[in-house]
Structures are given as C-alpha cells and as structure tokens.
Amino acid sequence: MPSPILPMLPISHLIGTEVRNLISVRTPNITMDQLKNGCCSILTQLETLLRSQSPSEMTIFQTLCDRCCGAEVANEATVECGKTMETTNLTSGGRYWPFHNGTNLSRISL
C-alpha cells in the first residue's frame, strides 16, 4: 500500500517522523533525545557516510540540518533530490518532501 502524501508540516513534525525514521536506519544508536537536542550536529556527522553511500540521501540530510538549525538553505534550486534519487513510484502516492515541491522520499522511507 503506498504511503500517504505528507501535507506541509513544520520541521518539528518531521523530526518526530521522517527524520527519526531516516536516522534510525543509518545510526540506530542515536536516541530521540539526542536527536531533538542536537539535530544539526548529528546530521552533519552523517554527511561523510551519506556522501559516500548515497549522495541523494546526503542532500536530504543536509537540508534537514539547515532547516532544523533555523538556517536558510543557500540555494534551494540546487537541491534536486527528485532527479537524483530515480525512484520508481513518483506518481503512485509515495512519500514526498514538503519543502521541495514533490520530491519523492519513497525509496528511503520506512
């Protein structure tokens, strides 16, 4: 069954859902308290791992880091996750990243 399309939500909601799911896959030893208290540093620490294993995931994590820290993304036009992820269900009700006009996260969603 396809995942629902996420409505526009504040980053605090994403920290509790999307970010938690993504972080738990990559670094299961990180607790939710650590995530809530140090979102930016945790995401930044994952950058090297993600850059080497999955550049599209690294882009998503870095964007989450910027949002979580309250910083503006320097140039959102360069964040083209949807083009790099090459997912297969862009049109079948997958999970979408609400800050980037329909970027699909189905490949890495739980």
Swiss-Prot record:
Location of the protein in the cell: Mitochondrion
Gene Ontology CC, one term: mitochondrion
Main location: mitochondrion
Record key words, sorted: Mitochondrion
Protein name: Uncharacterized mitochondrial protein AtMg00630
